[in-house]
Every structure is written in structure tokens, then in C-alpha cells.
Amino acid sequence: MAPPAKRARGLTLPGYKYLGPGNSLDQGEPTNPSDAAAKEHDEAYDKYIKSGKNPYFYFSAADEKFIKETEHAKDYGGKIGHYFFRAKRAFAPKLSETDSPTTSQQPEVRRSPRKHPGSKPPGKRPAPRHIFINLAKKKAKGTSNTNSNSMSENVEQHNPINAGTELSATGNESGGGGGGGGGRGAGGVGVSTGSFNNQTEFQYLGEGLVRITAHASRLIHLNMPEHETYKRIHVLNSESGVAGQMVQDDAHTQMVTPWSLIDANAWGVWFNPADWQLISNNMTEINLVSFEQEIFNVVLKTITESATSPPTKIYNNDLTASLMVALDTNNTLPYTPAAPRSETLGFYPWLPTKPTQYRYYLSCTRNLNPPTYTGQSQQITDSIQTGLHSDIMFYTIENAVPIHLLRTGDEFSTGIYHFDTKPLKLTHSWQTNRSLGLPPKLLTEPTTEGDQHPGTLPAANTRKGYHQTINNSYTEATAIRPAQVGYNTPYMNFEYSNGGPFLTPIVPTADTQYNDDEPNGAIRFTMGYQHGQLTTSSQELERYTFNPQSKCGRAPKQQFNQQAPLNLENTNNGTLLPSDPIGGKPNMHFMNTLNTYGPLTALNNTAPVFPNGQIWDKELDTDLKPRLHVTAPFVCKNNPPGQLFVKIAPNLTDDFNADSPQQPRIITYSNFWWKGTLTFTAKMRSSNMWNPIQQHTTTAENIGNYIPTNIGGIKMFPEYSQLIPRKLY
């Protein structure tokens, strides 16, 4: 029998199976992402040829897709292919869109988990006519640029982009490009375009992988700042400062700026409860991919008041006022995530929202003289001064970040940021040290049905194996395990620093059956109308306590150190219980201060908290990095997405005094639209167990939590994020 014919290798580059001309389409699995893109490109060319088209002499949609997929390639083959097809795009004629072989074979995209999987998504509405006119004009003038920069490269971008070129009401073009990490679009009064989209798309990629594309849009209201200056403000204690109340300490120094921060770094900005149900019930792992945001449809108005009594307010469009926009692509300014203060953009897409005022901590010297525990009634002596001159770091946005000036109808785009983070598990672990490894061999098994009839074990001194107690008693309590799941953490401990005392953070874990929240790092959330409180309520702020699902918590009140029958030394030469004093100080016990963290400690990551939790965080610039952050499950290995700042430019009057720090201003405010896209990849869960599992669902009793009241009131409830169990060992 003749040997099988060899597969045509063509002129592929060394180390690749598909990157190069002339190869066959059955070379096996691609060697890297660039090779995978080349395989898809070859398959598209094959379809062109079978349909009677010649893709080699025309620039096609497949070529454009290959360019996008290799835009950030680091391998040499991907770079060569990327620039080859960019050159082809510049010189070769183009195939029409109807010639694309991929128009009828798109992957399945589910727009929203709220729709039945079998329902047909609504068709796209045709774009307005003026968009095609604008694109044609932009193409003719050669101003169509793309921007897909990675702010994690820590290199400031100075290439301007046009987020969109628009026509003014008179038909003349106006506006211009911007610089820095983003760009401003050519604007024009009367022709403002954009889209309002809060859908979540689930694209199933095969082999258990899903791409989640979350869209968010908000109408943002921005008032002019109360002042145009930077202010260094000392904050002193507003609460009592007597002994035993140091948890009330508030003293610090902050720099208050005239700028506002647009922060979308919270789960509730991107997902609704139905989205989160689909993710938590079906995904076992998730990771961040990319993030981009845009400001568009800027409207600036001025307010004047009549001299009548009562005065009448008159609102006018101001076509010359400016909205200042700054994107800190290099993370030059202090990083101030707003989720821990519940000041991100609001969670309800149909409600207008507002950005928070940008401010940051400044170095200060905190002198503290608390009384001893024997002088409980003495007053704490404290004071605060400006920090050491060697520690002062005063930043202004005006000289640290490029600023773009937008007028009515203009828009601004940040470009695409690509994350570098570790995947996050959406499952919880139930195994503790008592559940790792092989259980002890039973002496007898029950013969009568019912849990009240247990099995029995051999005597503790007759069991075989090894443990770490130097006696012959081998019990489940003394059995050796491969590692330590969780650890005993000192809790409610306040360390002192130059800035004052602070509560030492604790890795959040699930409670034990004794419900010891504080020893296990439970997080307390407080929120207002925009972030979960009942929107029609005037009562106190909404609050809840969040405990993760993974079972690695401790119950310090139930722990003990025991001597007999073990050879252990302890304080009282006997049993040391939580009630025993240390150093003569009551209400302190050994387990409160014991830290068992070590090289054998095994930990789970910080759990995501929907809707109020922070999503990503900036890595601390220290030589020794923490393994986890308490505030967010994703920690960016390089710089995080740049912070986005906005401010209404000073709208001055003719009454100007250069010797005065504050000038008379025309009262100006702005409404503009913000939208963003946050992309994830996720792994779908597989069913390997016999028993069904607990899942997030609604009941007849709790469905009212997710729908408005008769007068429009609605609130957001925290949702579990790690319901699916997993084994550790």
C-alpha cells in the first residue's frame, strides 16, 4: 500500500503551521494565537476562492480581522503578518462587504440572559444617514485613525485619535483631534451621535470558553466646581476621643481638587442581577480582558437669574463653554478607587448619575498619646501637622496629564486597555484540614439504616500511620495534613503608623457555625440611592454584611491549647482558654493575638461582591507584593486602567481681577453621556457529580426584591458569587 500523501506545508514560517502561503488547512492545532489567527484567515480565503472571488489581489474583511487579532502580537511571525496586511490594506483594492465569507457564519451571540435562549435577537437598526456622510468625509481627508493602546505598557501615548467626525448645523466641519491616551472627536452643534447600550453579550467560543462583553451607559450630570483651586485640608476627630474609642479616629490630611472622577470600577455598573445569576450559576472561572470608555453628546448650559421676586432661572445652551477631560494613562496621579467609598457611577442605567470629587491623601504628622489601660477615663491627646518636607507630594492634574477641551456635541474616547490579571475562581471550597486526604479506616460499619447509627473506629493508640504529636494517640484532631487551609488571624488589632492608627486588614473567609464575623474578616457595606438603597426611602442608609462562601474561617472563642495528654508548654501550665488573661489585662486572650500564617498556609482569593464590590485594583509599588488585596479580586500586574477626570472649564465674566484668587464665574453645568465596554473570558462549569447543586434563583417570597414598587422604588440586594462547590484536594 502506498504511503499516505504528506500535508502541504507551503511557505510557512519556522515554528508555525499556518502562518504563510500555500499550506493546507489540516496541519493540526495552531502553535500560538498568531498561528490560530492565520488558520482562520486561511479558512476565510478558502471560502472566498470557492465562491469565485480572488482574495489575493483584494483587501478583504478576513485581512482586516487578521490585522486586529495580531495587533498586540509579541511573536515575530505575528508581527510580520500584521504589517504585511497593513501594507496590503494601503495599496490593494477592497472587496465589498457582501463578499465577506463570514457575514452569514457569525458565532452565537446572546444579547442578554433575560431572553429565552431560543428567541431571536432584534435586528440592528440602520445607522443614520449623516454617519455615512461623516465617514466618507473623514476617509477622504485621511483622518480615520484607530487607537488600541495598552496603558499597562507605562508609556504615555501622544497619537491623537478622532472618536468621530461630525457635521455642524450649518454643514461645515468643526472640532479636532486630541492627544494623550485618548482622543476627542471632531464636534459640531446639532449633530451628535452615539448609542445607549447596557446589554451583556455571551459569546460561546467552544471548548467550554465564553467571552462576556458587558456594555454600560449612563447620563452624567456635572456641576461647575465650587472653587478653581487645590486645597490642603486637615481633618480632626469629630467623635469622642476617650480611651477605648480609638476606632473613632478620623484625623488625616487630604488634598481637595476642583476635578471630578468618573469611576466605573464596581460590578453593579456592568451587570444586572439576571446577568450575575447566569454568571454565578454557569461559570467556574473568570478573568478580565479589556476595558474602554467614551464621553459623547456633551451639552453645556448656563444659568441666569432674573431680578424679579421671586427670581426666575433661565437656562441657555452655551456653545463656547468647555468641558475639560483628562485621562491618566501612566497612573501618574494618586490612585483613588471610588468603590470602597460607594462613589462609583450609579447602578441603575435609567437614572442619571454624577461623578465624585477627586481628592487624595497628603502626608501628615500624627502625634498620639493614649492613656494606659489603667487610666481608662483619661483623655487621649492628639494633634496633626503638615508632614515632613521630605514626604510631601502635591499633584495637579493640569501639569501631570494632557487635558482635552470638549464643547457641545464633542466626544472623547480612551482607547482600549488590556488587563494582565490572574483568573478568579467563581466556586467555593468546602474542604478544611479535617477533610483532606484519606479518612481513617472503620472498625465497624452500621447495619441499621439511619444517621443516628454511626460507624466506629479502632482505639486511638492502635491506629497505623503518622502524625506530629510525640505520643501514641492518633485522632482526627492530631492527624497530619499536607497544608493549612486558612489560618488564625489576629483580629480587631490596630497598628500605629505616621498617619495614625489603622485596623489591620484580614483576608475575608466564611464563618464557622459559631458566626464569628469579625475574626473572619466579614465586610460591612453601606450604600445610598445610586448603589442599592431603596430609591424612594428617606430612612437610614442601606447596609449588609458580606461573608464569602469558602470554608476556611476560624472560631477563636472555641479554640484551645491543651497540655495533657500532649507535652506542651503554655502560660498557666494547664489548659489555656480564651477567658485566661495575659499580662494582667482582662478581656484579652491568646487566640486573639495568635497568627498562624506561614509557608504551609493555603488561601482562596478575595470573593467578588455583587453589586457593590470593586473589580480591579492597582498593585502596590513595593518590593514585596501582597498575595491578595482585600478590596478587589483582580490585581493588575502592571498599571491599571487610567483614571478619567472631568471638570467644567472656568466660564468667566468681564469682572476679572488678576490679584484675586477667586473670579466671578457664569454658573455653568453639563450633561453628557458616558459609555464603556468591559470584556471578560470565562470557563463554563461541567457536571461531574451525581447530586445537583445549589444555584442562585428566585422564589415567590423574594421576587419582589428585583422589581419596582408601585411608585417606582427599587433597591439592589447583594448576590452570592461562589455557589458552585469545588474540592481542594
Curated annotation (Swiss-Prot):
This is Capsid protein VP1. One of its GO terms (biological process) is viral penetration into host nucleus. It comes from Porcine parvovirus (strain Kresse) (PPV). The N-terminus of VP1 is sequestered within the mature capsid. It contains a phospholipase A2-like region and putative nuclear localization signals. Residues 112-128 have a biased composition (Basic residues). Belongs to the parvoviridae capsid protein family. Gene3D superfamilies: Parvovirus coat protein VP1/VP2. InterPro entries: Capsid/spike_ssDNA_virus, Parvovirus_coat, Phospholipase_A2-like, VP1/VP2. GO terms for molecular function: metal ion binding; structural molecule activity.
